[in-house]
């Protein structure tokens, strides 16, 4: 089996370069979007006495730079406003015109001590000056039929059993140089193979402008929670190690369930019974001892979900993947010999593997951490799973999956999936953060994959960012560039802050660099070794 899931981008931000501010922000730092000729990352002391209105005022003041084509308050809608862990106010805005949101055009504003300190994200310039149609010529139903037919013809080769996905909506899609009115259609299905496809359908003529699979992969006698008493059971995982797990005893049913009531809104583990219907049945046992071989995948999925919850809570102050203590649900024994695991947008799903290429996927703690980090990304930056933004999405999951493994101190290393991949081959893994080239992945931007396979190389080009993260943590010399390591903890803090507070759906590698530099400055000071090490690490992999 090919180790990379064969999953192609919205090019809001292509090559970036440093650019000076206008007179009103003299001497500040800016990263420039070469495609749209507008800023994608701005930092420094911008304006004081900040509020939503101040952000609008600054953008209007810099109208020749941002080229919004109208008043900022008419083009940007506030969609989020919160305080972060450092006491900074973080506001998220979406660009819209004629009530249609602009796909991926999100702006994040940071306020520190009452002063606007940074803007990140890329906006589409001069929409009011373009011949942009704002009324659709085809209906929602027609757009949905076109997307479903394309799935049947080109993806599954048969009509899939579609599930309810995100509602179809009209958006402004930045199709190369000409933004277009388009329908965003979500086609979600589990058979014949799982998929969570996003389609951009031209609202004028029904043409498929773009499509990608947003399925984030690694490569009581029912589904409802039960009322009962919290207990602790014991069992054996996929690799034969014993674990204590939080369960719930229902006196009504007389069974112990894999339902952990001690963390957030609960952790629930289900038995898929080798079918493809989710979530399956809440796992039940008669004596609270889970030592049967069939139990092993469930023991690990349940236990490791708790470890991931604890990592994000204790290290980053994050309560579950959504930040609001959402329940974590996992299904094991999905399908027969299914060689993958995925986050489907609402829960975790683990295949059993075929016993040769893979063991049950829940047996790898870094795999569980990887997949649940996709959920964190969904609720924060929302990185589009295609091209560079998709590779960042994958790299974030590799980074935090690895950090979870170190946090739990379960034979930690810088390999991905080594515990469950090719059980008959020692020393093998899906990917390596320390040496991406070991498994054929690029370790420098000059070696990046530029084709369309794997959604534009999301599982391949992630190696570039993985190497940067490894160098930032451990240090070393790479392509002649010396990097001073700052340790895993600080590296994780920097990448987490970049993910949650600076990245936007279409961020590319250069924007990630700028976000990590700013995150390090926020945490450790603008003249700190940490900031210098971030720059060194990205220099070493050719990302500027």
UniProtKB/Swiss-Prot annotation:
Temperature dependence: Thermostable.
Cofactor, how bound (note): Binds 4 Ca(2+) ions per subunit.
Binding site for Ca(2+) 3: 405, 411, 413, 418
A biological process term (GO) from this entry: proteolysis
CDD domains: M4_TLP
PROSITE patterns attached to this UniProt entry: ZINC_PROTEASE
Subcellular location, record wording: Secreted
Propeptide segment residues: 26-225
Binding residues for Zn(2+): 370, 374, 394
GO molecular function: metal ion binding; metalloendopeptidase activity
Catalytic residues (UniProt): 371, 459
Family: Belongs to the peptidase M4 family.
UniProt-recorded name of the protein: Bacillolysin
Organism: Bacillus caldolyticus
Underlying gene: npr
């Amino acid at each position: 089996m090919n180790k990379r899931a064969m999953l192609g981008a919205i090019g809001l931000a292509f090559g970036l370069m440093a650019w000076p501010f206008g007179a009103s922000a003299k001497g500040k730092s800016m990263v420039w979007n070469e495609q749209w000729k507008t800023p994608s990352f701005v930092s420094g002391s911008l304006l004081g006495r900040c509020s939503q209105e101040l952000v609008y005022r600054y953008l209007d003041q810099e109208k020749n730079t941002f080229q919004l084509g109208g008043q900022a308050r008419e083009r940007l809608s506030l969609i989020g406003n919160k305080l972060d862990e450092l006491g900074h106010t973080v506001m998220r805005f979406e660009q819209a015109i004629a009530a249609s949101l602009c796909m991926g055009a999100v702006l994040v504003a940071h306020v520190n001590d009452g002063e606007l300190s940074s803007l990140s994200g890329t906006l589409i310039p001069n929409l009011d000056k373009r011949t942009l149609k704002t009324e659709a010529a085809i209906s929602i139903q027609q757009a949905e039929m076109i997307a479903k037919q394309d799935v049947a013809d080109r993806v599954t080769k048969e009509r899939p059993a579609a599930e309810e996905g995100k509602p179809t909506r009209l958006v402004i899609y930045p199709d190369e140089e000409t933004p277009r009115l388009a329908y965003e259609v979500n086609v979600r299905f589990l058979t014949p193979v799982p998929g969570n496809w996003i389609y951009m359908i031209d609202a004028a003529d029904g043409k498929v402008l773009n499509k990608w699979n947003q399925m984030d992969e690694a490569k009581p006698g029912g589904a409802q929670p039960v009322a009962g008493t919290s207990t602790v059971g014991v069992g054996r995982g996929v690799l034969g190690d014993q674990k204590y797990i939080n369960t719930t005893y229902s006196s009504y049913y007389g069974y112990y369930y894999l339902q952990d009531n001690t963390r957030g809104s609960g952790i629930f583990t289900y038995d898929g019974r080798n079918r493809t219907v989710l979530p399956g049945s809440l796992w039940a046992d008669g004596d609270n001892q889970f030592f049967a071989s069939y139990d092993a995948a469930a023991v690990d999925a349940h236990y490791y979900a708790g470890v991931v919850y604890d990592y994000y809570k204790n290290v980053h102050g994050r309560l579950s993947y959504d930040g609001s203590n959402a329940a974590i649900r996992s299904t094991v024994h999905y399908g027969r010999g299914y060689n993958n695991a995925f986050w489907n947008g609402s829960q975790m799903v683990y295949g059993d593997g075929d016993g040769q290429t893979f063991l049950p996927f829940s047996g790898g703690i870094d795999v569980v951490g990887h997949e649940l980090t996709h959920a964190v990304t969904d609720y924060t930056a929302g990185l589009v799973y295609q091209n560079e933004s998709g590779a960042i999405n994958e790299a974030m999951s590799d980074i935090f999956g690895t950090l979870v493994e170190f946090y739990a101190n379960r034979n930690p290393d810088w390999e991905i999936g080594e515990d469950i991949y090719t059980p008959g081959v020692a020393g093998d893994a899906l990917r390596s953060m320390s040496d991406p080239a070991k498994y054929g992945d690029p370790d420098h931007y000059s070696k990046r994959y530029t084709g369309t396979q794997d959604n534009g190389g999301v599982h391949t080009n992630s190696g570039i960012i993985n190497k940067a993260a490894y160098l930032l943590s451990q240090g070393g010399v790479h392509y002649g560039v010396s990097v001073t390591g700052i340790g895993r903890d600080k590296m994780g803090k920097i990448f987490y802050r970049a993910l949650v507070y600076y990245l936007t759906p279409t961020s590319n590698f250069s924007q990630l660099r700028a976000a990590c530099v700013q995150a390090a400055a926020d945490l450790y000071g603008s003249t700190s070794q940490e900031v210098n090490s971030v720059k060194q690490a990205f220099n070493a992999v050719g990302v500027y």
